Every structure is written in C-alpha cells, then in structure tokens.
C-alpha cells in the first residue's frame, strides 16, 4: 500500500489539522506562499515519490487565490512523482454557475474549474455537498461527493427540538428538506416560496405548511449573504413559529452576512468548518460551527485503502 500523505493549502488550515489528528498522522511539509508580485509560490519540502497524496483546500474566499494554490500544489506533486493525488475540497467554489439558462451569454464556471483540476493532473476529487450534484459529470476523474447531513443531524437530535418542522428556504431545496425530515422521524416540512429580483437579494412571498407554535429547522447547502435565510426566518416567526434554527454545510457568509444574521430573528445558525469562520461572524453570538474532520478523515482512509465510500452512509 502506498504511503499516505496529507498536505494543506492556506484556506482551511484548522480543518486540515483536525483531519490529520483523526488519522494519527502529521500534515506534510510544504511551503505555500506568494512571490513579491502576488503569484502563488509552492515548495514541497519532503519526498512524495510514489505516495498517496491528499491535498486539503477549500476554494472559498479569496476564491481565486485558494483555487490557484490548489492547482499549483497539484502540479508540484505531479512533478515530484506522487503516486496518486486526491484533491480534498470541502467547499467547492464556482459551483453556482453550472448551466446556461435560455442560452444566456454566460460561462459554466463549474465546468471550467473541473477542467482546470483535471488537466493539471489530479487523480481524484473528494468534496462535500456540491451545490449541484451534476457537477460530478464535468470531471474526467472520479469524484466522491459526500454528504454533510449526518454531522448536522447529530446536532438536530441533541438540540431538543419541540414539535419540529423542517423548512426549505426555496422550492429548489424541497428534496433536501424531505430527506432531513425523513431522517428526523418523517416529520412535517414547510416551504418558503420566494422571488429573487436580482443576485443576493430575495423577497419572501409565501409560506406553505403549518409552523405555528413549532420549532422550525431551515436546511440549505450554503449560506451566502444570509438575505434569503433572514427573511425566511422572519416569515416563519410572523406565522407563529416558536424557534427558528438554520442548518447549512457551507458558511460562505459574504457581504453583509454578519449584520444580517446578528439583527435577524434567527435563534441559532449551525454550520460546518468546510470554510473557516471569520471573527466577525463568530462575534454575532448566533453561529455554531461543527467539524467535518471525522467524516473527511474516514473518507480519506477509505479512499487510501480502496474501500467503499458509499458504505459510510448505508
């Protein structure tokens, strides 16, 4: 069996260290810095010839910097004769442009990034909760898209929810809401119907379902500015919801997210460490962060040992 080695870029160093601790190994020795003109500089400081290399790097903000770090690290590993290179991308950026709508003159950036990673020499990709599952098909290498739901469900079960109802923040999230509701004992779901006049601005229009006197659990794959989420929570409280919790795998938290969430009627927002939480978000007092390290460590172990990934969720 090839020697397994873990390396990390600068996007999520804390998560990378937690994964290494779970696997009882040390992070590999690599210097990831910048040249004086801002270009990415990578130096691998140990032998990786023939090794089973895993590079842990979310492509979150600053998205372009983190993506280039990942790409340059993959190239460095390939040129150093690594046996196999797996890109572990807890949060896969550029995933929201995955199709052209009505032949609009726009790029499909998810495909661009997939080609970028494939062409530079990655052998496999491990990620969590892709914004659109069909993005896996953009790659010419195997992709393991695992689910962060078990980590979130564990917190839901421990939270002592009273007469809970799972809420989808939009019509597109109904499948996720139904799956969560089933995992919580086949409980009720509700749907917030919204209209989005422009990017990152949303308006709640209608609520489908009964939430009066009940704890509401809003589920989504990511939270960006929090505009949709906060307006959904407001609509739920106006309809008599007792408490409103929001669960999401990816804490993008861009723009006015901290202000929006701090001033909202949300009781708590629960996210994972696929993206490092900023000090500003932590200071809101409304955000709880769970770790994906155990799940990712197990997935990495299984990939290295040629074991089934899907068996993790059976």
From Swiss-Prot:
Chain sites annotated for binding Mg(2+) 1: 131
Location of this chain's protein in the cell: Cytoplasm
EC number: 2.7.6.1
Binding annotation for ATP: 37-39, 96-97
Family indicated by similarity: Belongs to the ribose-phosphate pyrophosphokinase family. Class I subfamily.
GO cellular component, one term: cytoplasm
Keywords: ATP-binding, Cytoplasm, Kinase, Magnesium, Metal-binding, Nucleotide biosynthesis, Nucleotide-binding, Transferase
Free-text function comment from the UniProt entry: Involved in the biosynthesis of the central metabolite phospho-alpha-D-ribosyl-1-pyrophosphate (PRPP) via the transfer of pyrophosphoryl group from ATP to 1-hydroxyl of ribose-5-phosphate (Rib-5-P).
HAMAP family: RibP_PPkinase_B
Pfam families to which the protein is assigned, alphabetical: Pribosyl_synth, Pribosyltran_N
CC cofactor note: Binds 2 Mg(2+) ions per subunit.
Cofactor: Mg(2+)
Biochemical pathway: Metabolic intermediate biosynthesis; 5-phospho-alpha-D-ribose 1-diphosphate biosynthesis; 5-phospho-alpha-D-ribose 1-diphosphate from D-ribose 5-phosphate (route I): step 1/1
Superkingdom per UniProt: Bacteria
Reaction(s) this enzyme catalyzes, per UniProt: D-ribose 5-phosphate + ATP = 5-phospho-alpha-D-ribose 1-diphosphate + AMP + H(+)
Presence of keyword ATP-binding: yes
Annotated protein name in UniProt: Ribose-phosphate pyrophosphokinase
SMART domains linked to this entry: Pribosyltran_N (SM01400)
Name of the gene encoding the protein in the UniProt record: prs
Broadest EC class assigned to this enzyme: transferase
Subunit structure: Homohexamer.
A GO BP entry: ribonucleoside monophosphate biosynthetic process
Active site: 194
Residues involved in D-ribose 5-phosphate binding: 196, 220, 224-228
GO molecular function: ATP binding; kinase activity; magnesium ion binding; ribose phosphate diphosphokinase activity
InterPro entries in alphabetical order: PRib_PP_synth_CS, Pribosyltran_N, PRibTrfase_dom, PRTase-like, Rib-P_diPkinase, Rib-P_diPkinase_bac
Residue sites binding Mg(2+) 2 per the record: 170
